[in-house]
């Protein structure tokens, strides 16, 4: 059986004839291999087609019978090889394949009026070695090609598309020229139609062009093309506005915040064990804070950010001497004298005021003689020299890497400038807030002036500088260390000079004092020897644990029929601070959270906030009262604090998460 080639004619393809040779040459892009069941040889189809001189004029008055409107003899339909008109085209050795393909393609076009077969728009002509030389094959291709416009015109009326999902297009036909290339290959160029062609398996795409006409300056055909709006602006858009869009976009990045001094993309090494480098968008602001984001979008939205306080940090550059180490006052004798050369070789030098000129000012005489091992380590460290490190006062390290040396030096210099500016602004802020510091000093002085606060509450050491918040007492530094070992449940230690003191804490300390506290915690210490300033730490610790942890010296409760919780409610309502402290020292968490009777549901915290007494409210919270508790009316303690207009109570309750809304 001969080798088979197929040529599919599409409506978007026009033909050209050579007036001299007249050969019809289908384009190579329109010739494709058959399916897996077809067999194909490498002979080109154009070489098998005999030339013929044909010129066809197609106009508006041209009317042709379409191929599918013509009746086919029954003999040809069922046995094409038996018909003399078709025997030269369809050979007996391929008639089975031809019939099966023709029937499968024409199943949906059977006419109910006439017993004839109608054929699809997309016609397929089968060519093999023995049929490509027939003299009327050229006319067959021309007839099929010229009747395509008639089919498309009639298709709009029937609404019967031969090809599924094919859209309707307008069609106009002008003069069709068919010519053959000199190289023997064919080309089919469309000069008149805008109809999309059916898909082709060819690797080359056909080129379409519209020739100029003599009558009109515009093309003859009216193209109906669907343009993509992917790169076009919307209707009614302002061109000037579009040109200004990039500028406005750059201006709106990070709007509403301080403009960074320096910003850009840097690589940051993760702190996990993988040690991977990821891109981060880093900003450096004038407030001395270095912030890095996962991306530029996160920076614009101000989300997923992490900040580094440069005021308490320093910067290190691998392979660079620290600025303080460049002094000529301290020569380095050997590499084993003080370890500075080791730090230099390993690239861990500290750079506080780095600049390119600083490293060059170091005298070569001061450099220690390098050893072979040191040179090897230094060579290994030079593999990545565009990185720098930021180290905080707590030892946390952030590794960053720039793309070039210049970019790294620019970042290092900018960060060093902000570190220096932050330190200077810290000094200036201290000088500006001298009046506030003086007022705080006066408040702390009032705490020290409380009765008994001139000496340590446990060992009588003079001028104590440490405090226990929930006990309301002052102590020496040695006793404060023992109090810390008790835990915050028993003693909350704070420095009188180093820590901040809000208003509510100052009020608590100014309301209790050492004498009042000792009258409660040492109320039953008769016959016990209290440690002195010269006592050992073991003696002081033994006394403190017996006093606060075991409560051996605690004053007894008053004799009454009321429970401890009811006594606490009454003392809170009467604002009796000394009795309340005694009851809190004896009571448990359940007794502290006891509510008022008669269905009221108020706790001692509700009563303290109703009175606006921040001292009692704070002490109750420290001793375990439920901040989320509500009374019978669904009100929290914050509701009563707002009714009493006590801002101190409101601040304390909000700090501990008290809900604001009623149920």
Swiss-Prot record:
Residues 185-216, 231-255, 359-381, 519-540 are annotated as: Disordered. Keywords: ANK repeat, GTPase activation, Metal-binding, Repeat, Zinc, Zinc-finger. Residues 203-216, 519-530 have a biased composition (Polar residues). It comes from the Eukaryota. Encoded by one of the numerous copies of centaurin gamma-like genes clustered in the q11 region of chromosome 10. Putative GTPase-activating protein. This is Arf-GAP with GTPase, ANK repeat and PH domain-containing protein 4. It comes from Homo sapiens. The gene is AGAP4.
């Amino acid at each position: 059986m001969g080798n088979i080639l197929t040529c599919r004619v599409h409506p978007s393809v026009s033909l050209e004839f050579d007036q001299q040779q007249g050969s019809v040459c289908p384009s190579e892009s329109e010739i494709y291999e058959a399916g897996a069941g077809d067999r194909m040889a490498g002979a080109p189809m154009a070489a098998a087609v005999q030339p013929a001189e044909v010129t066809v004029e197609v106009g508006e008055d041209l009317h042709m019978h379409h191929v599918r409107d013509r009746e086919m003899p029954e003999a040809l339909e069922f046995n094409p090889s038996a018909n003399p008109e078709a025997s030269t085209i369809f050979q007996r050795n391929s008639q089975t394949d031809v019939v099966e393909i023709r029937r499968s393609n024409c199943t949906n076009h059977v006419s109910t009026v006439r017993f004839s077969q109608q054929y699809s728009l997309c016609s397929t002509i089968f060519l093999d070695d023995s049929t490509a030389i027939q003299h009327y094959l050229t006319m067959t291709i021309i007839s099929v090609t010229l009747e395509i416009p008639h089919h498309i015109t009639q298709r709009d009326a029937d609404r019967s598309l031969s090809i599924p999902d094919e859209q309707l297009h307008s069609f106009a036909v002008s003069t069709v020229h068919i010519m053959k290339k000199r190289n023997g290959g064919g080309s089919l160029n469309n000069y008149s139609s805008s109809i999309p062609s059916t898909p082709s398996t060819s690797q080359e795409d056909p080129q379409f062009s519209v020739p100029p006409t003599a009558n009109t300056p515009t093309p003859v055909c009216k193209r109906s093309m669907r343009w993509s709006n992917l790169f076009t602006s919307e209707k009614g858009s302002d061109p000037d506005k579009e040109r200004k869009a990039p500028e406005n976009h750059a201006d709106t990045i990070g709007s509403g915040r301080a403009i960074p001094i320096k910003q850009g993309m840097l690589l940051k090494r993760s702190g996990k064990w993988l040690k991977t480098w990821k891109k981060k968008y880093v900003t450096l602001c004038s407030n001395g804070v270095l912030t890095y984001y996962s991306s530029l979008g996160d920076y614009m939205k101000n989300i997923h950010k992490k900040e580094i306080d440069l005021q308490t940090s320093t910067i290190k550059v691998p392979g660079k001497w620290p600025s303080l180490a460049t002094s000529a006052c301290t020569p380095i004798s050997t590499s084993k004298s003080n370890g500075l050369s080791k730090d230099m070789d390993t690239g861990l030098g500290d750079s506080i005021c780095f600049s390119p000129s600083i490293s060059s000012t170091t005298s070569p005489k001061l450099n220690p003689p390098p050893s072979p091992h040191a040179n090897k380590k230094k060579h290994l460290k030079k593999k990545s020299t565009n990185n720098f490190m930021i180290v905080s006062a707590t030892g946390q390290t952030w590794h960053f890497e720039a793309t070039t040396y210049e970019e790294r030096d620019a970042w290092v210099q900018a960060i060093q400038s902000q570190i220096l500016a932050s330190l200077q602004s810290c000094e200036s802020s201290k000088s500006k807030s001298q009046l506030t510091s003086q007022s705080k000093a006066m408040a702390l002085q009032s705490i020290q002036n409380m009765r008994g606060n001139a000496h340590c509450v446990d060992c009588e050491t003079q001028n104590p500088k440490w405090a226990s918040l929930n006990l309301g007492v002052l102590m020496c530094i040695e006793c404060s260390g023992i109090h810390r070992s008790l835990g915050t449940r028993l003693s909350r230690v704070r420095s009188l000079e180093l820590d901040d003191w809000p208003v509510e804490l100052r009020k608590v300390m100014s309301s209790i004092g050492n004498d009042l506290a000792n009258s409660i915690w040492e109320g039953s210490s008769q016959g016990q020897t209290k440690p002195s300033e010269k006592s050992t730490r073991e003696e002081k610790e033994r006394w403190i644990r017996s006093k606060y942890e075991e409560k051996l010296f605690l004053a007894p409760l008053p004799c009454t029929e009321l429970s401890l919780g009811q006594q606490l409610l009454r003392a809170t309502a009467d604002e009796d601070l000394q009795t309340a402290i005694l009851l809190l020292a004896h009571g448990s968490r359940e007794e502290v959270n006891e509510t008022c009777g008669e269905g009221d549901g108020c706790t001692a915290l509700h009563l303290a906030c109703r009175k606006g007494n921040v001292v009692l409210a704070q002490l109750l919270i420290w001793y375990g009262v439920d901040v989320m508790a509500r009374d019978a009316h669904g009100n929290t303690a914050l509701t009563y604090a707002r009714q009493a207009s006590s801002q101190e109570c409101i601040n304390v309750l909000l700090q501990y998460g008290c809900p604001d809304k009623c149920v």
